[in-house]
């Protein structure tokens, strides 16, 4: 069955790739005139529920962006013959259904794909198929995947290479002696405070550098940080690591992240809409850990690309076994295990471990969940005003229930 699914996926890609049509003109963006909040309000968690919605679907108005052009021939996403109408599941001893999940977790968009077909597609709060929604840290997993593509192309020789080989500006900083693998595991040992609502945290320092829109300001923040532990020995969630990863990518490939994403994935997989990616400064480098926005279906297509092993038309975009390595729990240099891959979250329950399930996750309730065993992809757009703690229901409980029901 998996073989036939892979062949069908490849055939669909081959069909649209062989055509020579130019991209159809896109409709005007339906939310372009909405009033929005500020990026500081996003991270402070003080937006009203209504303002959070309008802001989250207009983040490309907060900073300069670089476009990731759509494909000239979008990959079809056919609807399943039998749609998923509801799901019942338990979490924390309580019973829930699909509607309660959508309402209690303030889900503004939900896409469920099984074997490449749409089992459920739901938009809320005025969103439509044209809406671009913020990724938040789902962008980190995009950056990780582009690192894999650069390794495949030989632009990056090895994950064991030192960061400073590709980013000499960090020579003499706490990133001296840190490998690319350490960065992907968020285990550089460089001191970092990720607290979103603390204006004095390192995460907010990085955000202020972005707000300044001065070229090189984000890298300057990363180069100023002290060491807290030996490289590769402590996992500490650190958005700054992904800005270092972005610098590695740009210097290794000689291209912007948006251009490289378009060339390697966006155009080849067959995305139907342009995406946008925040920049550190006008015409500068992308923000490697945040600020990406795309349509619900295109997030889903990215999930299908992963589900198909990172292959397009039979060609591997990623190194052999890259996804298995990137999306499974890693072991630190001192032998300690962590429930984290290469900028991907790994399943922690026995069921998720059995299925090899993994996810990209962002604050305010953003998820891209992939279950290779069940052949399921789930995209969740969250409209939670608070960066963390806004979900009533454990999202992974919902994901596991869906994957189980669709086996």
Language model segments and positions:
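Active-site SXXK
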Residues: 116, 133-159, 183, 245-249, ...
């Amino acid at each position: 069955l998996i073989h036939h699914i892979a062949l069908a996926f490849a055939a669909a890609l081959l069909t649209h790739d062989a055509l020579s049509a130019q991209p159809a003109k896109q409709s005007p963006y339906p939310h372009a005139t909405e009033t929005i909040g500020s990026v500081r309000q996003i991270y402070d968690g003080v937006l009203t529920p209504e303002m959070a919605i309008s802001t989250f679907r207009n983040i490309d108005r907060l900073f300069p962006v670089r476009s990731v052009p759509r494909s000239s021939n979008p990959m079809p996403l056919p609807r399943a013959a039998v749609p998923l109408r509801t799901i019942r599941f338990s979490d924390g001893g309580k019973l829930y259904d699909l509607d309660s999940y959508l309402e209690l977790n303030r889900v503004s968009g939900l896409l469920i794909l099984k074997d490449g077909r749409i089992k459920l597609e739901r938009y809320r709060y005025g969103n439509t198929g044209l809406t671009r929604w913020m990724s938040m840290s789902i962008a980190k997993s995009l950056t990780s995947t582009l690192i894999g593509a650069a390794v495949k192309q030989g632009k990056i020789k090895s994950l064991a290479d030192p960061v400073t080989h590709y980013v000499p500006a960090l020579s003499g900083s706490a990133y001296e002696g840190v490998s690319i693998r350490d960065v992907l595991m968020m285990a550089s040992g460089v001191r970092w405070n990720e607290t979103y609502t603390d204006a004095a945290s390192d995460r907010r320092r990085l955000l202020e550098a972005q707000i300044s829109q001065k070229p090189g300001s984000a890298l300057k923040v990363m180069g100023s940080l002290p060491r807290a532990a030996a490289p590769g020995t402590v996992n500490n969630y650190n958005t700054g690591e992904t800005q270092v990863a972005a610098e590695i990518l740009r210097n290794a490939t000689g291209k912007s992240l948006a251009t490289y994403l378009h060339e390697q994935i966006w155009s080849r997989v067959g995305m139907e809409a342009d995406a946008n990616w925040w920049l550190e400064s006008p015409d500068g480098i992308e923000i490697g850990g945040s600020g990406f926005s795309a349509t619900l279906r295109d997030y889903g297509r990215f999930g299908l690309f992963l589900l198909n092993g990172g292959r397009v038309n039979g060609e591997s975009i990623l190194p052999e076994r890259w996804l298995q390595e990137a999306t499974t729990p890693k072991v630190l240099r001192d032998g300690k295990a962590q429930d984290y891959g290469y900028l991907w979250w790994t399943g922690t329950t026995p069921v998720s471990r059995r299925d090899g399930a993994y996810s990209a996750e962002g604050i305010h309730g953003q998820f891209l969940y992939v279950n290779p065993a069940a052949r399921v992809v789930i995209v969740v757009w969250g409209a939670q005003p608070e960066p963390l703690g806004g979900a009533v229901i454990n999202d992974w409980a919902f994901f596991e229930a869906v994957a189980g029901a669709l086996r």
